[in-house]
Regions:
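N-terminal targeting/trafficking signals and adjacent low-complexity tails
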Residues: 1-190
Length: 190
C-alpha cells in the first residue's frame, strides 16, 4: 500500500488559525511557549514536573477504573511506569460519541501511543500515553447520533445526567441499524 501524506491545509477541515499554528506562523508565536514539533516537545518535557500526590492519584484512579478488566501487558507496564517520578505522559482525550465518533478519535489514540513511543526513544525517559474520555460534561443530544454517509443513525431516549452513566437501553437497535446501513459483509468489518 502506498502512503500519500496529506498536509493539514489540503484537507480543508482546519481553520486558518490551526494551519498557521502548525506551520509556525511568527504572528502566533507569542501565544504559546513550545512549538508543535519534536524540539518543542523535548523542551516542554524538560520543564514538566508532576507532583507526587497527583501522580499517585492518577495511578490509583486508573487502577480503579481498570478493575475487573483483563489488562494487556503494555497497559500493565505503563501503569507501573507511571509510578516513577521520571515518567512523562502524552495526554489527550475526546468527548464521548456514539460509535466513538469521527475517525479521528481512534486516530488520536493511535497517535498518542506512537508519540509516547517516539518520545521515549528520543528523550531516554519513559513516556506513557494517557487518553481520557469526556463522559460527564455534555448532554445526550450532543452524542446520541452518528452520520453514516448521508444516513443519520440515532439512539432514541431522553435519559439525563452524565452520559457515561446512562443505561444502554435501545443501543442494540441502533447497532442493528448501523449494520443495515453499512452492510454485514467482509468489507464492513474493515
Amino acid at each position: 500500500m502506498q502512503r500519500i501524506p496529506v498536509p493539514y491545509p489540503a484537507t480543508g477541515r482546519f481553520s486558518a488559525l490551526v494551519n498557521d499554528y502548525l506551520s509556525g506562523d511568527a504572528s502566533l508565536r507569542e501565544h504559546y511557549v513550545h512549538a508543535p514539533d519534536l524540539n518543542g516537545l523535548r523542551a516542554a518535557a524538560e520543564q514538566r514536573r508532576f507532583a507526587p500526590a497527583s501522580r499517585a492519584a492518577l495511578v490509583a484512579t486508573l487502577r480503579q477504573q481498570y478493575q475487573g478488566v483483563e489488562l494487556h501487558e503494555a497497559v500493565q507496564t505503563n501503569l507501573a511506569a507511571l509510578e516513577a517520578d521520571s515518567t512523562l505522559t502524552v495526554t489527550t482525550g475526546h468527548q464521548l460519541c456514539l460509535f466513538t465518533g469521527p475517525l479521528y478519535v481512534p486516530f488520536k489514540l493511535l497517535n498518542a501511543i506512537r508519540l509516547a513511543n517516539t518520545l521515549t526513544a528520543q528523550l531516554g525517559r519513559k513516556v506513557v500515553p494517557v487518553f481520557w474520555m469526556a463522559t460527564e460534561d455534555h448532554d445526550r443530544y450532543e452524542i446520541d447520533h452518528a452520520w453514516l454517509g448521508d444516513q443519520k443513525v440515532q439512539w432514541p431516549g431522553s435519559a439525563g445526567g452524565p452520559v457515561g452513566r446512562m443505561p444502554l437501553t435501545g443501543i442494540k437497535a441502533v447497532i442493528d441499524e448501523a449494520v443495515a446501513v453499512l452492510g454485514a459483509g467482509e468489507a464492513a468489518r474493515e
